[in-house]
């Protein structure tokens, strides 16, 4: 019999909110009787934007901004129907993007 697996990818700009959400998911899955591997930290994406400080000229004067996207991966192996139901009801912060693959 093939093992069922739920793979959850979390993305957020703030790593503290991301870690709290991952901890909530792991705790909920373990409480409902599924085995969990993770949260596994994935590489952080860093987007750098360069902007001219002056409006018209002075191209040598620039300012750089960066956005960091932190990611985590959680695998839930052999989930029960109770696990899926409790994960559907879980309330997570608004700054976290969730991708779920079955």
Curated annotation (Swiss-Prot):
Record Pfam families: Ribosomal_S10
InterPro entries hit by this protein: Ribosomal_uS10, Ribosomal_uS10_CS, Ribosomal_uS10_dom, Ribosomal_uS10_dom_sf
Keyword Ribosomal protein: yes
GO biological process, one term: translation
Gene Ontology molecular function: any one: tRNA binding
Disulfide bonds: none
One CC-aspect GO term: ribonucleoprotein complex
Superkingdom of origin: Bacteria
SUPFAM superfamilies: Ribosomal protein S10
Keywords on record: Ribonucleoprotein, Ribosomal protein
NCBIfam families assigned: PRK00596.1, rpsJ_bact
Quaternary structure and partners: Part of the 30S ribosomal subunit.
PANTHER family per record: 30S RIBOSOMAL PROTEIN S10 FAMILY MEMBER (PTHR11700)
Protein family according to the UniProt entry: Belongs to the universal ribosomal protein uS10 family.
Function: Involved in the binding of tRNA to the ribosomes.
Protein name: Small ribosomal subunit protein uS10
Provenance organism: Listeria welshimeri serovar 6b (strain ATCC 35897 / DSM 20650 / CCUG 15529 / CIP 8149 / NCTC 11857 / SLCC 5334 / V8)
Lineage, broadest ranks: Bacteria, Bacillati, Bacillota, Bacilli, Bacillales
């Amino acid at each position: 019999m093939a093992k069922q697996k739920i793979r959850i990818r979390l993305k957020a700009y703030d790593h503290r909110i991301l870690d709290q959400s991952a901890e909530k998911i792991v705790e909920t899955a373990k409480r409902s009787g599924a085995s969990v591997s993770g949260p596994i930290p994935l590489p952080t994406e860093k987007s750098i934007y360069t902007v001219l400080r002056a409006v018209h000229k002075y191209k040598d004067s620039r300012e750089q901004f960066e956005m960091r996207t932190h990611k985590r991966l959680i695998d839930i192996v052999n989930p029960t129907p109770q696990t899926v139901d409790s994960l559907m009801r879980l309330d997570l912060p608004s700054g976290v993007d969730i991708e779920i693959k079955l």
